[in-house]
């Protein structure tokens, strides 16, 4: 089970598609400072359990245009987190890049059986402080994505910790020829779009569901990295 909202926004300054994730993350983060619970997670440096996709409709030239209206989808593993984000964005209304227009009600989403996950935004995995790139071991990438998902699950459900003998993903495909560079704090963070084939057992399914809500790998709430869509049975 995961949750979803759609935020309709007017873009106040044109933004390149590799720069806009940082700007969206900063807008949501700034709004979150108006909410005590969201503010606390900001200072705790813990998993925030939400992530967001690229604004829709996509722009073919790769630049989101000033004065146009777009929709941003936000996922979370925690329903209340989305309610708080929605209220906080309405309270903040705008920053230098975005003007809030509307928020949809929070919807709960459930797939009874997830067969695969695709990261629509690049997933960011760092190994010893450096980004995973396609020259490195795919096995290592798989292990890191699994370990991250397991930590998120155990953070959400500390009373029912899970440790799997094998990764929840049985196959992985890198969908880009070269890494994608997202702007972050004046530098670039490299990520990759991935297709993850999910195992059928109960715990693998639980981890896949957490990845749908909280995002795959790192920088989910700050850059919308690892925002996933799923294939499976409703």
Language model segments and positions:
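RNA-interacting cores
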Residues: 1-234
């Amino acid at each position: 089970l995961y949750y979803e909202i759609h935020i309709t926004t007017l873009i106040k300054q044109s933004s390149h598609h590799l720069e806009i994730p940082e700007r969206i993350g900063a807008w949501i983060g700034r709004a979150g400072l108006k909410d005590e619970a969201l503010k606390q997670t900001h200072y705790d440096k813990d998993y925030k359990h939400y992530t967001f996709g690229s604004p829709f409709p996509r722009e073919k030239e790769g630049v989101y245009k000033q004065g146009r209206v777009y929709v941003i989808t936000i996922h979370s593993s925690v329903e209340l987190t989305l309610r708080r984000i929605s209220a906080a964005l309405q309270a903040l209304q705008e920053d230098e890049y975005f003007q809030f227009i509307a928020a949809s009600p929070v919807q709960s989403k459930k797939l009874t059986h997830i067969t695969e996950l695709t990261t629509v935004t690049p997933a960011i995995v760092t190994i010893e402080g450096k980004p995973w790139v396609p020259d490195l071991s795919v096995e290592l990438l798989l292990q890191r994505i699994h370990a991250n998902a397991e930590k998120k699950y155990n953070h959400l459900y500390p009373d029912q910790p899970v440790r799997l003998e094998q990764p929840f993903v049985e196959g992985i495909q890198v969908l880009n020829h070269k890494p994608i560079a997202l702007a972050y704090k004046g530098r670039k963070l490299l990520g990759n779009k991935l297709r993850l084939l999910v195992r059928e057992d109960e715990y693998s399914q639980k981890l896949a569901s957490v990845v749908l809500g909280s995002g795959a790998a790192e920088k989910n709430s700050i850059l919308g990295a690892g925002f996933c869509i799923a294939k499976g049975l409703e």
